[in-house]
Amino acid sequence: MGIKKRSFLKKGLILGLSCMMIGSTVTITSAAQESKSLTEFANVLDVSADPKEAIYGTYSTNEYNNFSDLGAWHGYYLHDKSATDLYGGFAGPVIIAEEYPVNLSDSINKINLEKITAAGIESIDLTKATTQEIYYPGRLEQIYDLKDLTLKLKLIFGTNRTALIETVIENKTDEELKLNVSWDGHLFTYYTNPNNKMGTTLTKENNGIRVNFETIRSTWNYMTTEENSFDIVLNEDDITTEISDDLLSYTITRNEPVVIDANSKYETYQTQSFTYTTDERTTEKQNVVDLLENPNKYFEENNNRWQGYVDTIFENKTNVNENYQKAAVKSIETLMTNWFSPAGAIKHDGIVPSMSYKWFIGMWAWDSWKQVVATTYFNEELAKNNVRALFDYQITSDDTVRPQDAGAIIDCIFYNQNEDRGGDGGNWNERNSKPALAAWAVENVYRQTGDKEFLKEMYPKLVAYHNWWYTNRDIDQNGIAEYGGMVHETCYDWTGYGYEIGQVVEGFGTVNDQGFVLDTNGERIVCPEAGIEAAAWESGMDNATRFDREGNGPDDKGIEIYTVRNDSHDPIGYVINQESVDLNAYLYAEKGFLKSMAEELGYKADAEKYTKEAKQLQEYINENMYDEETGFYYDVQTNEDGSVKKLLVNR
């Protein structure tokens, strides 16, 4: 059955893009007009910067926004007007040291011009120019307007590893203009503070330079290997490259002057590539050849792609309030900058919450579903692949680490897996899942694209994930789920939550030499703080007061942890003593989405099953989780066997 595509703005998802809020609507009436040009959306997102080694500003967030595209793992800024030492090049780049943003330079490559006349050589001072620094959707531009010439720089991403830069010098005079042309750049030596050396050096390459990296595995700050490489390649044949003795700065000089006829122009191009492995670098070298041989093709394709994004969201409806238009474009720019292509353990393209925040260069089973719904309106393949990226690591029954969690989607994935998986990453998290929004995301992709093959691909995976909630997160098996956590080492380590070896913990026991507390059967007990933290993270609400251990008021016994067991009495997870209304509302909606998918795929029995289950869950929520006096829904406190229930109106 064909699915009619929905209008992006007409359905009011413009605010959903920027805020990622479910259910926000904006009523807009509009008529077809000419499409909006990309040049009408200059600098709707501020990427101006004067980047430094100490990249972070407030809350471990990059002090400046940057631009990236196509899933590249590096990005650029426009220089601040006041940062005149950066004139002549694009500020940056910022690279992702596998999981962390780092400024490689304040300007890795700047052009220098000298005017040659009969009277001698005159250095051209770009700080005397009238300048424009512009971020259009999909590209950065700089314009330096001087008396005799205009210098124009444009930057786009040509591939998911390479930026393509166009340099145009226009002779504004009626006479021939002769110029000496060179480029220079340098490396930062440390990240965050002077004690953290980046281990980078420069070497000469054909038609350019290479930044070499050392193997540095700082789990929580900076992770590189000797295979990493940042390469600059110019489409200039006759050049001389000089590198400083400390291998941190360089100059590339054209051996012959550039001669520009009256009222004519000179064009040249370069690429800047950041790759993680030798194989990536080899592949990208071939891509660079094509980029430099056919630059106009790539600039045209880039413009068409971004114009397509804008045309799709407006669907030629351009009399929408200007602020809403800008918000929509700004949202797309944000999503595309946060697009990351396969690298390391990440197998499919996806979107991270923020390229700027230190701890957010990964993909979460929570943020991703919302990003998928937004992205499917203008980049359908990226939306599909973002779903796949998380399901690539869906737990299976033959998993070597946690087969008891078959069906689960783990909390988040990063470039590096954790030690249990043979990696050395610290951010990869399998301790908990996230709220059940995956089916909602897939349903939205299908309704937007009509791709039944994608629906067939995802349906059994979604069913397995849905079932997991009822095998591993339902302590009394009443069909009502609770938030909790996986069987995970961090949940048993009491010393990680402020307890000391030998400490007697009232109601639990003594912390042994391994940091564990054992019950009378010798089984490890989940540390309450660890268990509550995992459950709170699983909710997506993290530090919400509804998860305070002490509860609220004299009649509230607070949070307790219950172990969920299989038929062999083996632990397969744990939950808190709360049937959460939000989780079960998500699961109710998910049953509806699964019913709809089953109908589309012709699975009649499944459709009937989910219809029945949804009705039962709806009745439970309305009868047991709603308080008529206050007019709100609340969580229900439960004991382990489900014989005692209490509506938590006090929270």
Question: What residues fall within each predicted segment?
Answer:
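Carbohydrate-binding/catalytic loop surfaces
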Residues: 347-362, 404-431, 479-575, 630-651
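Conserved oxyanion/phosphate-binding beta-strand-loop segments in alpha/beta enzyme cores
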Residues: 124-136, 314-358, 397-404
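Terminal accessory carbohydrate-recognition/targeting modules of carbohydrate-active enzymes
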Residues: 31-323, 358-359, 366, 377-381
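Helix-terminus loop motifs that line ligand-binding clefts
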Residues: 344-350, 363, 379-495, 622-636
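Extended, well-ordered alpha-helical scaffold segments
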Residues: 283-309, 323-330, 379-392, 452-470, ...
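Catalytic cores of carbohydrate-active enzymes
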Residues: 301, 463-498, 585-651
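Hydrophobic core
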Residues: 17-25
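Well-ordered alpha-helical scaffold segments within catalytic/enzyme domains
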Residues: 311-320, 369-382, 437-452, 585-604
